[in-house]
């Protein structure tokens, strides 16, 4: 049902392009279409935020913007103008939403104040200004905190250290890099000795804290879909995916880890499975964690099983064993 909604939503948004003068569909036509995605329904069910990418073929550039449309139907409107804006995420109270923007200091988390009666933004401000940039923001269920991911130097324990290493790398005349292990690149993006870590920051502002320190990617690299990290319903715990194998490039042993939002030692809750565990989601009552699991180590194309972890007994039960429908990531 969610896939059907997303498809129809995207079709309606691009339909006006095809209503213009008829001509053979060209590559330029395809590239000029607005790319719509990330639809999120407001807590009261009245509004849908989504992102749309504007393409400038002459400038060879793409710029995302946040749009809004009534969930009951109506005309869509661009909600944030004057700066790029992507990945909108509602606050639990529906009075604010977070989004990503590169207007100041690279990709950072911004907060917009929202008037639910008029469907307009009444103000906005930048929440983070971390030198290593931010992405993948996620509100806590109580609205007090926001998670985000930043690619940092694992040997650095604070922002000052990361800022210093970034400055040194920028000023260095030597741009060659030495790699002593895999993985050193995903597609065209070099890791440059950095790791993905999950940070938490108070929604009212403050210094971000690294919840997943160490020489590991947390979360692991993903091709899209469900975030590989989630808040518990009470907002006190984080569950995320990380691979701590020594030869991670040849391993699919992604595990689920839990850690307090206040910080501390993380606990591996899927250590017994040598294959991949991913895409955690807490049950609304907080008693369980649902997730995807494979059973064949080292085989990325192994089918996914829907598993449920009992937080009290620490027991796991297999709910399904099937090939996930495309686009669902196994969790519907």
Regions found by a protein language model. Name each.
Residues 28-64, 192-193:
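Beta-strand-rich domains and repeat architectures in extracellular enzymes and scaffolds
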């Amino acid at each position: 049902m969610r896939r059907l909604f997303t498809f129809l939503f995207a079709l309606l948004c691009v339909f006006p392009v095809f209503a213009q003068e008829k001509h053979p569909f060209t590559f330029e036509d395809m590239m000029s279409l607005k790319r719509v995605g990330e639809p999120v329904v407001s807590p009261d069910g009245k509004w849908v935020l989504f992102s749309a990418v504007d393409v400038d073929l002459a400038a060879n550039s793409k710029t995302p913007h946040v749009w809004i449309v009534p969930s009951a139907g109506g005309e869509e409107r661009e909600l944030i103008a004057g700066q790029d804006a992507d990945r909108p995420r509602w606050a639990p109270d529906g009075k604010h939403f977070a989004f990503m923007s590169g207007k100041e200091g690279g990709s950072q988390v911004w907060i917009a104040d929202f008037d639910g009666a008029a469907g307009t933004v009444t103000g906005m401000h930048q929440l983070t200004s971390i030198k290593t940039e931010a992405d993948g923001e996620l509100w806590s269920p109580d609205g007090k905190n926001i998670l985000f991911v930043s690619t940092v130097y694992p040997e650095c324990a604070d922002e000052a250290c990361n800022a210093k290493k970034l400055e040194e790398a920028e000023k260095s005349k030597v741009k060659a890099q030495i790699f002593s292990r895999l993985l050193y690149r995903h597609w065209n993006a070099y890791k440059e000795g950095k790791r993905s870590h999950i940070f938490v920051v108070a929604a009212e502002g403050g210094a971000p804290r690294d919840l997943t320190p160490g020489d590991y990617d947390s979360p692991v690299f993903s091709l899209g879909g469900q975030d590989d990290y989630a808040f518990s319903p009470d907002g006190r715990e984080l569950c995320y995916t990380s691979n701590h194998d020594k030869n991670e490039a040849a391993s699919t042993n992604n595990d689920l880890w839990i850690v307090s939002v206040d910080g501390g030692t993380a606990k591996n809750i899927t250590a017994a499975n040598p294959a991949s565990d991913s895409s955690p989601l807490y049950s609304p009552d907080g008693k369980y964690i649902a997730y995807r699991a494979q059973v064949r180590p080292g085989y990325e194309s192994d089918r996914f099983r829907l598993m449920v972890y009992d937080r009290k007994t620490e027991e796991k039960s297999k709910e399904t064993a099937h090939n996930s429908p495309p686009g669902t990531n196994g969790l519907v």
